């Protein structure tokens, strides 16, 4: 009956407005404690409870909360800097102005003939050009400076030098010339002595080879003259001795050639 009376009262009233409570703690006052809704609201959002719903918060309050969150995020970003990771980047290759041609090109026949047409003229040039050039250099050197060092070198020729300075320069040049000649002579003597020693060694080796060759020939003759030895043994010994004889003869020829070369070199120094 009470609910019907309340419905009638609501229908009869023209301007029925819901009075929004000041805080969430006063939700239960809209319903009272006589019904279950009021009791539940009182237990949930009463003065003794700390639950704060978002029902009462307006749009303006929500915007404020968003701004506060943004400010907090900005503070966190300023205080704690995020680590920056630098990833390696591939460098682009520089474009060449004139790219290299990797294709193999064959020379045309006309180019080959042009490059080889002077071959007949070049091949007949004598090999002794270098020798002639060296002799000409030595002649000029002897005429210009080494003429017993009695001529002043061109670097000391100016008229600014006094007679004493020129005399001192000539004496120094003479001393240097004598030192160079002595050093060259000592080198030549050492070289000649080494060639002579090598020649003696080769002569000794040649005599040993000749003696060995004569011994092998005599041994071969003795084997051929002996009748008691089998024919197969004779053949084997003949093959071995013939091989040794050829090798020793080659060694003897090589020794003779080496001795001839050394004698020619020694004749140039005499």
UniProtKB/Swiss-Prot annotation:
Superkingdom, taxonomy of origin: Eukaryota
Region (Disordered): 1-21, 53-77
Ranges in coiled-coil conformation: 182-270
Keyword Coiled coil assigned: yes
Keyword annotations from UniProtKB, A to Z: Coiled coil, Merozoite
Name the record gives this protein: Uncharacterized protein MAL13P1.147
Biotechnology: Possible candidate for an effective malaria vaccine as determined by epitope response in sera.
Organism the protein comes from: Plasmodium falciparum (isolate 3D7)
Extent of Basic and acidic residues compositional bias: 58-75
């Amino acid at each position: 009956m009470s609910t019907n009376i309340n419905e009638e009262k609501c229908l009869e009233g023209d301007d029925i407005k819901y009075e929004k409570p000041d805080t969430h703690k006063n939700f239960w006052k809209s319903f009272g404690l006589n019904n279950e809704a009021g009791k539940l609201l009182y237990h949930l959002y009463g003065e003794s409870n700390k639950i704060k719903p978002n029902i009462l918060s307006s749009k303006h309050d929500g915007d404020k909360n968003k701004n506060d969150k943004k400010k907090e995020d900005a503070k966190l970003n300023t205080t704690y800097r995020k680590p920056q990771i630098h990833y390696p980047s591939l460098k682009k290759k520089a474009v060449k102005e004139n790219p290299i041609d990797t294709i193999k090109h064959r020379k045309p026949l006309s180019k080959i003939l042009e490059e080889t047409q002077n071959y007949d003229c070049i091949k007949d040039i004598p090999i002794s050009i270098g020798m002639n050039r060296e002799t000409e250099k030595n002649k000029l050197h002897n005429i210009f400076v080494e003429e017993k060092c009695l001529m002043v070198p061109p670097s000391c020729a100016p008229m600014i030098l006094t007679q004493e300075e020129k005399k001192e320069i000539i004496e120094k040049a003479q001393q240097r010339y004598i030192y160079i000649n002595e050093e060259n002579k000592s080198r030549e003597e050492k070289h000649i002595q080494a060639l002579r020693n090598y020649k003696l060694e080769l002569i000794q080796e040649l005599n040993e080879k000749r003696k060995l060759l004569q011994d092998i020939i005599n041994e071969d003759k003795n084997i051929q003259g002996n009748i008691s030895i089998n024919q197969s043994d004779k053949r084997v010994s003949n093959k071995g001795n013939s091989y040794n004889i050829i090798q020793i003869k080659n060694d003897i020829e090589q020794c003779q050639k080496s001795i001839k070369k050394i004698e020619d070199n020694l004749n140039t120094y005499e």
